[in-house]
Amino acid sequence: MSPCVNSSVQCATRKSLPNMMIRRFLSSAAYDATLNTLKRDLKTAMMQKKAVEKNTVKSVIAAIKGAEIDGSKQDEFALFKTLSKMHKQRVQSASEYASQNRDDLAQVEQAEAGIIERYLQSLPVASSAQVQDKLRQFCSQVQSQEGEVPMKKVFGMVGEVVGEWNTSMELVRPLVPGVYKEVWGDKKK
C-alpha cells in the first residue's frame, strides 16, 4: 500500500514539492539577492522593533512567495512587477487617507511606500522613463529606416531587443501604443 493512499494532502505535497524545488533553482541572481536582503532586513527590523518596516517587509516577502506558488517567473522583472504594484497601492492608499483627514494612516502608508521604493530602486531593472526613452529612440530609428510600420510589427521588433534594455516585454508592452502615436501620429494600423 502506498503511503499516499490515506492522505490526499500528502500526495499533493509530494507531487508538487519537486516542481517547487526545481523552480527555485531557476531564479535569477538578482532575485535571490533581493530575497536574501529582504530576509536580512526583516530580521534587523524585528531586532530593532521597527513595526512599520517589519510589517512592510513581511508583506513583500508574502507577496513574492505567493507569486512563486502561482508559478510566475522568478527573476528581477517579476519582482519589479510585484513591488511596483505594492508601491502603487500604498501611494493610492496614502492619498485616500489624506483626503479623508486620516493623516496617521496616511503617514504609515507613505512610510511603507518609501520602504518598498527602496527595494524597487535596488533592482537592476530599467525604470519606466528609461524604457520609454529607449522605445522612443528605437521607434524613431525604425521610422527613418522603414517609414510606415504597423504597430503589430513594432511589437515584434521591440520583442527582439527588449533584453538589451534590461527590462521585460511585460513592462514595455503598455508603453508601445503611446510612443507609436508620438512617432507615427494617431494612425491605427
UniProtKB/Swiss-Prot annotation:
Keyword match Electron transport: no
Entry's Gene Ontology cellular component terms: mitochondrion
Organism superkingdom: Eukaryota
InterPro entries: Asn/Gln_tRNA_amidoTrase-B-like, YqeY/Aim41, YqeY/Aim41_N
An annotated Gene Ontology molecular function: carbon-nitrogen ligase activity, with glutamine as amido-N-donor
SUPFAM superfamilies: GatB/YqeY motif
Keywords: Mitochondrion, Transit peptide
Organelle targeting sequence: 1-32
Keyword field contains Transit peptide: yes
Predominant cellular place of this UniProt entry's protein: mitochondrion
Localization terms from the record: Mitochondrion
Family: Belongs to the AIM41 family.
Protein name: Altered inheritance of mitochondria protein 41, mitochondrial
